[in-house]
């Protein structure tokens, strides 16, 4: 009963015919309920969905499977954020249903859904407890370790604890990494960056680049540049910012960042040149004037620096007052 090649109405006809021929098969009622909720979430349609789920439970040989499927349907319904919730189709109801399934047989896939529902309810401690059980089971996967890592992150656990779970996630992939591993590499890179592990983050970005065969955008180069700066790999940072600007030549943030890195390595004239290029794009870009002033201070051009700071203040830069107070009074 494949639905992907059929219009929903045609699929409904096929399901009705199947149910009339096999009235004691839970599968027909489950499929019809899913098809119906896909087409409409009006109250009358939802009555039909609920009736089919009740019937599926009534005829099911495996009651746990029926409870699980009802929990999954209610969970999916709530994830779509209905304007008005149908009867008691809440996350709490979904949790109650999946726990009925678990009480019959504690399959890891049921416990995973329990964790997902608790995560949606923002009950992160309970979600983590469920995910940890799944990660000790035969269905542990990169995705399940990633869920646990994100949950720990939201619980504001120590970065080392979060990264330990991400390491377990990545350990389930074979190297060289495929495109399937790419999203997880990106996540770990960002986590490493946030934890101050710039070199590790940079290496993850490098692996991501290889996994997606170089199919990256300007934002990728911007993030990898931040990792390179943290790792004190300044030439790599400069190269990545140049690439980001090449791909998105109107993004002023990249010009500012390129100037900051140039100032950091003592290339103050180059920083001023970059910032003047930014002002060609937007003459009212206040941050550019502030950073020009910083570079001019490094070049002992204090009078010019104060004029640049004054221009930044005139244009509304929120961070220039302290510099004026320190250098221009």
Task: Label the predicted regions.
Residues 26-27, 63-65, 108-109, 141-143, ...:
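Helix-start (N-cap) detector for alpha-helical repeat units in TPR-like alpha-solenoids
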């Amino acid at each position: 009963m494949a639905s992907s090649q059929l219009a929903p109405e045609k699929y409904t006809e096929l399901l009705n015919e199947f149910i009339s021929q096999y009235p004691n098969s839970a599968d027909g009622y489950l499929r019809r309920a899913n098809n119906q909720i896909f087409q409409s979430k009006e109250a009358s349609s939802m009555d039909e969905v609920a009736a089919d789920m009740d019937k599926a439970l009534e005829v099911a040989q495996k009651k746990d499977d029926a409870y699980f499927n009802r929990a999954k349907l209610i969970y999916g319904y709530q994830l779509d954020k209905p304007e008005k919730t149908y009867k008691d189709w809440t996350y709490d109801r979904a949790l109650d249903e999946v726990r009925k399934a678990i009480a019959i047989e504690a399959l890891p896939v049921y416990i995973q859904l329990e964790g997902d529902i608790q995560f949606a309810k923002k009950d992160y401690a309970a979600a983590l407890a469920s995910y940890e059980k799944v990660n000790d089971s035969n269905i542990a996967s990169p995705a399940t370790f990633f869920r646990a890592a994100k949950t720990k992150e939201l619980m504001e656990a120590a970065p080392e604890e979060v990264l330990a779970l991400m390491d377990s996630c990545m350990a389930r992939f074979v190297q060289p990494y495929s495109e399937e591993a790419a999203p997880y590499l990106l996540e770990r890179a960002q986590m490493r960056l946030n934890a101050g592990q710039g070199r590790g983050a940079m290496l993850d970005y490098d692996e991501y680049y290889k996994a997606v065969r170089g199919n990256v955008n300007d934002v990728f180069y911007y993030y990898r540049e931040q990792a390179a700066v943290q790792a004190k790999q300044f030439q790599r940072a400069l190269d990545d910012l140049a690439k980001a600007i090449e791909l998105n030549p109107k993004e002023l943030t990249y010009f500012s960042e390129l100037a900051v890195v140039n100032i950091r390595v003592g290339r103050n004239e180059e920083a001023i040149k970059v910032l003047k290029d930014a002002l060609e794009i937007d003459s009212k870009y206040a941050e550019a004037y502030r950073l020009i002033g910083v570079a001019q201070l490094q070049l002992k051009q204090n009078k010019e620096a104060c004029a640049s700071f004054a221009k930044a203040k005139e244009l509304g830069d929120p961070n220039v007052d302290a510099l004026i107070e320190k250098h221009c009074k």
